Amino acid sequence: PGFSTPDWAKGAIFYQIYVDRFANGDTSNDVLNREYIYINQPSKKIDDWYRYPEEMDVRNFYGGDLQGVLDHLDYLKGLGVDVIYLNPIFVSPSNHKYDIQDYDYIDPHYGKIVVDEGNTLPDWENNNMNASKYISRVTDKRNLEASNEFFIHFVEEVHKKGMRVILDGVFNHCGSFNKWMDAERIYENQYGYEKGAFVDANSPYRHFFKFYN
């Protein structure tokens, strides 16, 4: 690919959206309290959008999603926006989503959860292998495919308003939740997934990483 600036970007007004903190358009896909453990602490659902952020706020979720952005397209168009720039939206355990878990799919917490099985973690449980609701939400292909389809619809609607969409791609690093690594052992027993490099020395992804004693 070339590195020249496309004509449509020259002089365009870009509006950057941190999706979790923009608007909650679909409460059925909200991250729940203790849905999983992230950096040694449970995920937390925040209802008060006017509270001060915590010092370690990456596991706190306000419920913003793509439906919330979709609901505000006329507002964005009215501001004179030409391009909507979305912070990462692929499957990830953090609210910033710079530690992508699955590069192939939009996070169902931002898209669509059509199959919602399992349970949140009890107070005494800190092992993500037992985070059955989270595992169902982010590994069930029905949720993942529905979320990708919704994103296609989202982009089509943005285009109808005369605006464009660009994504924040994060391709040079991932996190322990990533399905190629699977240090959290989320994918280990799920149908349709290869073993992660952390789980199995014979994993097809083993050569993606370097391991040291």
What residues fall within each predicted segment?
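Extended acidic/polar, glycine-enriched regions
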Residues: 1-8
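Structured loop/turn residues at beta-strand edges in well-structured enzyme cores
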Residues: 8, 12, 79
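Mature N-terminal segment immediately following signal peptide/propeptide cleavage
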Residues: 12-19
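Substrate-binding/active-site clefts of carbohydrate-active enzymes
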Residues: 19-82, 89-213
